[in-house]
């Protein structure tokens, strides 16, 4: 196994965890939330995706390397709006595998949390 590297952009955390771990070309991002950008699903989703972009960049990666995404929402009624924002964020890259769930609560009163896994240089153009 390669050396385990911490991925961190210095953002405040709500617990004892590392925002991301990188081993060789495999990248795992802890669940990301954004409660600073606003209290609505649109601003929190956009802010959370921006945090993911920043963490992936810190690992010399990008959203094109994502292979698995898990989305947690406190209201499944957000699903359509989250999909619109997520689709726009992805652009024309191959979408990663994904699951989305409704949960009763998230840390800090967040409305959405997104967990990601990536393999650096996995971007394939069709």
Range-by-range predicted roles:
Residues 1-67, 73-123:
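N-terminal presequence-like segments and the immediate start of the first folded domain
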